[in-house]
Regions:
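N-terminal assembly/interaction segments in proteins that build large macromolecular machines
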Residues: 2-240
């Protein structure tokens, strides 16, 4: 049967694979979408394996809270097109839900969780095969407290925060704090929480800045004493 552009576009949206890959898969599968997806998956796994050394700099990061427990997880890929694909985002959400339900302590525990006919890692590998892009779970953190809050930035799936509190906090206030953390990226709750290493680096920067300012002032003073205005030395208005 003839493969139409509408069919190719539909399969591309379903899989995130390239237009030509979708066309070839549909042609080979004689228009059967399920068979075409399987063809793309198998071919894509081989391609993805060759891309193992490539950088996966895009992806989806999501956070979730159950009250006293919160989790953030990141699933990475190579392109923004795949990162925005609904199935890729859903896979990230499904993995997050499993991690929260099982209260996994480490990323390795998450990867080993049962999912579908295999494990979470198998599901990621399958998705990588469908798109032909390198994919990896690369980011996992949990917090626990009397209460927790999360912030997912404007549903963009690229920025989120998780916060744990050691006492009850109004839900709206907790969300606002989580949002402010996303906006300001503070390094500590208060000054006492700033590490000595960070403090020392800031002190060194301040010292170097002060030295530079002192040198500049000394130069300006010396020029002034010699009756030289550095702003006018090269002026075309000067007469010989």
């Amino acid at each position: 049967m003839a493969v139409t552009m509408a069919d190719i576009t539909k399969l591309r949206k379903m899989t995130g694979a390239g237009m030509m890959d979708c066309k070839n898969a549909l042609t080979e599968a004689e228009g059967d979408f399920d068979k075409a997806m399987e063809i793309i998956r198998k071919k894509g796994q081989a391609v993805a394996a060759k891309r193992s050394e490539r950088e996966a700099s895009e992806g989806c990061v999501l956070a979730k809270t159950t009250g006293d427990y919160a989790v953030v997880i990141a699933l990475k890929c190579e392109t923004d097109f795949v990162a925005q694909n609904a199935d890729f985002v859903k896979l990230t959400q499904d993995i997050l839900d499993l991690a929260v339900a099982n209260k996994c302590a480490t990323l390795d525990e998450v990867k080993a969780l049962p999912m579908g006919n295999g494990t979470v890692q198998d599901a990621v590998t399958d998705r990588s095969g469908i798109t032909g892009e390198k994919m990896e779970l690369d980011g996992y953190m949990t917090v626990e407290g009397v209460c927790t809050a999360v912030y997912n930035h404007m549903n963009r799936n690229g920025l989120c925060t998780i916060v744990a509190f050691n006492k009850e906090v109004n839900e709206q206030l907790a969300k606002q704090i989580a949002m402010q953390i996303a906006a300001m990226n503070p390094i500590a709750i208060d000054e006492d929480g700033v590490s000595e290493e960070v403090k020392q680096k800031e002190i060194e920067v301040a010292i170097e800045k002060t030295k530079a300012e002192q040198v500049q002032k000394a130069v300006e003073a010396a020029l002034k004493k010699a009756n030289i205005n550095p702003a006018h030395v090269d002026s075309e208005e000067h007469m010989d």
